[in-house]
Amino acid sequence: MGRIRQTFIKRTGEELIEKFADKFTSDFEENKKAVEEVAMISTKTLRNRIAGYVTAKVKKMNA
């Protein structure tokens, strides 16, 4: 069983995918930089969790 992500992470990730779909790929490192560019995220941990969620969503969409 996987970990359940917080609603804030899911909501933020979904909004970023809707607005900036062309910036995100299936590569976590690139998504980390993209999240930092387009969103005002206060902590590194939160940025990484959102980038991880976006990466997983992009991989599911492309599969």
From Swiss-Prot:
Superkingdom, taxonomy of origin: Archaea
Gene3D superfamilies: Ribosomal protein S17e-like
PROSITE patterns reported for this sequence: RIBOSOMAL_S17E
Gene Ontology molecular-function annotations: structural constituent of ribosome
Keywords: Ribonucleoprotein, Ribosomal protein
Pfam families linked: Ribosomal_S17e
One GO term (biological process): translation
Family that this chain belongs to: Belongs to the eukaryotic ribosomal protein eS17 family.
HAMAP family reported in the protein's UniProt record: Ribosomal_eS17
Protein name, entry field: Small ribosomal subunit protein eS17
Organism whose genome encodes this protein: Methanococcus maripaludis (strain C6 / ATCC BAA-1332)
Protein's gene: rps17e
